[in-house]
Amino acid sequence: MSVRRGRRPARPGTRLSWLLCCSALLSPAAGYVIVSSVSWAVTNEVDEELDSASTEEAMPALLEDSGSIWQQSFPASAHKEDAHLRPRAGAARARPPPAPPGMFSYRREGGQTASAPPGPRLRAATARSLAHASVWGCLATVSTHKKIQGLPFGNCLPVSDGPFNNSTGIPFFYMTAKDPVVADLMKNPMASLMLPESEGEFCRKNIVDPEDPRCVQLTLTGQMIAVSPEEVEFAKQAMFSRHPGMRKWPRQYEWFFMKMRIEHIWLQKWYGGASSISREEYFKAVPRKA
């Protein structure tokens, strides 16, 4: 009787040990599954890499509790069998299990809320306050001079929107016909007046450069007209109360009063573009007391 040489059959104990090792290695993978396309699980190595590479200041705002997008993993048949046990629409939902460690999630764009800009009332009040506090401004006109005809021409002029206790929001001027600005206005009465906050409380205490964008700048655009005889007395009070030296200016220059019929208001009080203010909000606003 011949004995055939061959491999010895595997022992039951060895096969059982091999199965136990495989199940131990695969058991962590059955813990959680991804049910949302915006999150994923990461390993400890990737976690350390994210921590070391992430230097943006906005990163804390991107992290959120996304436990609701993670669920315990079950076979597909279990989800189908439990469909009739799920709460109906409108019923109170149970709190989802906490998210496991090592989970990273991006916040969706729809959930982000940006800080709202100042409202129209606040902008209008700031504009009226600056208009009342300003004693001078830069008036830009369309030049009629031959060398620069049709180009903008600017001139710094004393202004006033009324006496200290009576703000109108309308800038008044004390002009002479010999000023080139008046010659420009006779042909084209449209002009722009820029009022800077160079002497404001904030700029004086916090800003070195008065032209810093954080200093408020108000631009009024409209039609320059002569003050009617009925308003001359008020114009005198407005200008002479803020500029007493005007009373002694030489009379041979034939001084007269003008004002701007405002059509557009623009306010800049931070980095970036200017904000438009409606005439209704501008004249309705009450300037802050100094």
From Swiss-Prot:
Residues 1-31 form the signal peptide. Pfam families: CREG_beta-barrel. Keywords: Glycoprotein, Secreted, Signal. InterPro entries: CREG (IPR014631), CREG_beta-barrel (IPR055343), Split_barrel_FMN-bd (IPR012349). The keyword Glycoprotein applies. Coiled coil: none annotated. Brain specific mainly in the limbic system and faintly in the spinal cord but not in cerebellum. One of its GO terms (cellular component) is Golgi apparatus. Glycans are attached at residues 165-166. It is not sure whether N-glycosylation is on Asn-165 and/or Asn-166. It comes from the Eukaryota. It is found in: Secreted. PANTHER family: CREG1 PROTEIN, PROTEIN CREG2. Belongs to the CREG family. This is Protein CREG2. It comes from Homo sapiens. The lineage of its organism: Eukaryota, Metazoa, Chordata, Craniata, Vertebrata.
